[in-house]
Amino acid sequence: MTSVIRFALLSLCLSPLLLSLLGSQTASAADWPTWRHDAGRSGTTTETLPENLKLAWSRQLATPQPAWPEDPRIGFDLVPEPVVVGRTLYLASTRTDSVTAYDTRTGQLKWKVFADGPIRFAPLVADGKVVFGSDDGCVYAVDAQTGKPVWKFQAAPSS
């Protein structure tokens, strides 16, 4: 099965699951538990930022690996899309096939988990779990604090 068809199947299966998880959680205004903040993809928050922001830490990330490098119209996975809940930043990677958790205050690595294919979209954090899909056709859930696997679902054929 081509990667485009596998990706479409995974997206169709994953969307209702992620929306149901997101609708069941209660997040503070400071949290950013999914891509563009909330189920409505508003990209806004009521959280007030301090007037004098300062860089606390930074990380050099691997250059993302595009899904279709020959098609200039498809650039959705060229930029990492972090999500933040509490003191943890979660970041998916197409280059390392992983989701990594960092402490937001120190930048220290908390944990890193791997899938069997690139992870092209931001994970979702809900009910103490980090949920993400991979090009391997699977949807994964790991414990948000430890990164330990909670469940794995084969949502689309692997090839």
Model-flagged regions — what are they?
Residues 24-30:
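Boundary at the C-terminal end of the N-terminal hydrophobic targeting segment
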Residues 32-36, 71-99, 113-140, 157:
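Repeat-blade elements of multi-bladed beta-propeller folds
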Residues 57, 66-71, 108-113, 151:
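A short beta-strand motif characteristic of beta-propeller blades
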Residues 8-24:
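Bacterial N-terminal signal peptides
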Residues 153, 157-159:
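Solenoidal tandem-repeat scaffolds enriched in leucines and small polar residues
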Residues 30-64:
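Blade/loop signatures of beta-propeller domains
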Residues 103-106, 143-146:
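Short loop/turn segments that connect beta-strands within beta-propeller blades
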Residues 1-7:
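N-terminal secretory signal peptides that target proteins for export/translocation
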